[in-house]
């Protein structure tokens, strides 16, 4: 019996909707990364993009545990000498694009490379409750019911 290897033409992608309100960011990102990669499927093949399309709503209401809300820093470099910049998670969540906290958490859990970049394009994160993907009829995934540790009261 030969090992099963899925071909790109055989991939069936579903649309998943996750409400991030009250969910712990790291645990949520781990679940999203597995869904994007397709590791939850029996047909998982490491070199094929067979993950699902994931829609995350209420990203601004996701929760960081401990003192990460005030102490966690996100760094980037402008490319100029002395151009290291930083922002705390609090500044990002209270800023214009609070969805970037979840995007960065998931991005750092997906492999870096051409396949990882293609899988990240299947992630759509929205700060509020509205999303333009009603036509895809996404199935709702209740992450809070998967494990009691996935939620944290604010």
Swiss-Prot record:
GO CC terms of this entry: cytosolic large ribosomal subunit
GO molecular function, one term: structural constituent of ribosome
Biological process, per Gene Ontology: negative regulation of translation; translation
A Pfam family per the record: Ribosomal_L13
Keywords: Ribonucleoprotein, Ribosomal protein
Intrachain disulfide bonds: none
Matches recorded under InterPro entries: Ribosomal_uL13, Ribosomal_uL13_bac-type, Ribosomal_uL13_sf
Key word Nucleus present: no
N-terminal signal peptide: none
Known role: This protein is one of the early assembly proteins of the 50S ribosomal subunit, although it is not seen to bind rRNA by itself. It is important during the early stages of 50S assembly.
Subunit (UniProt): Part of the 50S ribosomal subunit.
UniProt similarity note: Belongs to the universal ribosomal protein uL13 family.
Name of this protein: Large ribosomal subunit protein uL13
């Amino acid at each position: 019996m030969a090992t099963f290897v899925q071909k790109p033409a055989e991939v069936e992608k579903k649309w998943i909707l996750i409400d991030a309100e009250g969910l712990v960011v790291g645990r949520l990102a781990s679940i999203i990364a597995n869904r994007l990669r397709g590791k939850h499927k029996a047909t998982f093949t490491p070199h094929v993009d067979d993950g699902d399309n994931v829609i995350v709503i209420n990203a601004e209401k996701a929760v960081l545990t401990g003192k990460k809300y005030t102490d966690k820093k996100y760094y980037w470099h402008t490319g100029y000498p002395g151009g290291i910049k930083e922002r705390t998670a609090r500044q990002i969540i209270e800023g214009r694009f609070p969805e970037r906290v979840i995007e960065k958490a998931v991005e750092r859990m997906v492999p870096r490379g051409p396949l990882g970049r293609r899988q990240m394009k299947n992630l759509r994160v929205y700060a509020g409750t509205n999303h333009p993907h009603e036509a895809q009829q996404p199935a709702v995934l209740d992450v809070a019911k998967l494990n009691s540790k996935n939620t944290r009261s604010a």
